[in-house]
């Protein structure tokens, strides 16, 4: 009485198929698979957010001192 044999599980499966039908079982399986996939993508997104370095607060300009000096020299000529 402690464990079920393969025949017990086959009878239970047959009753479930008769009660719910194969279409509902297929929809249930695809819904469950979609939920698992969404959960995995959500966890992947959370891991990517944690691994990205925080943005720096320094503002970097595109000009260097050398280019500013060259611009001043060109305006003098």
From Swiss-Prot:
One of its GO terms (molecular function) is protein transmembrane transporter activity. The keyword Cell inner membrane applies. It is a single-pass membrane protein. The keyword Thylakoid does not apply. GO terms for biological process: protein transport by the Tat complex. GO terms for cellular component: TAT protein transport complex. Residues 40-77 are annotated as: Disordered. It is found in: Cell inner membrane. Residues 65-77 have a biased composition (Basic and acidic residues). The chain crosses the membrane at residues 1-21. It comes from the Bacteria. Keywords: Cell inner membrane, Cell membrane, Membrane, Protein transport, Translocation, Transmembrane, Transmembrane helix, Transport. Pfam families: TatA_B_E. The Tat system comprises two distinct complexes: a TatABC complex, containing multiple copies of TatA, TatB and TatC subunits, and a separate TatA complex, containing only TatA subunits. Substrates initially bind to the TatABC complex, which probably triggers association of the separate TatA complex to form the active translocon. Part of the twin-arginine translocation (Tat) system that transports large folded proteins containing a characteristic twin-arginine motif in their signal peptide across membranes. TatA could form the protein-conducting channel of the Tat system. Belongs to the TatA/E family. This is Sec-independent protein translocase protein TatA. The gene is tatA.
């Amino acid at each position: 009485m402690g464990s079920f044999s393969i025949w017990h599980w086959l009878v239970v499966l047959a009753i479930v198929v008769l009660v719910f039908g194969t279409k509902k079982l297929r929809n249930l399986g695809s819904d469950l698979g979609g939920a698992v996939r969404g959960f995995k993508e959500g966890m992947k997104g959370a891991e990517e957010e944690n691994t990205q370095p925080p943005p720096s607060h320094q503002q970097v300009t595109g000009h260097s001192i050398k280019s500013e000096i060259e611009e001043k020299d060109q305006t003098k000529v």
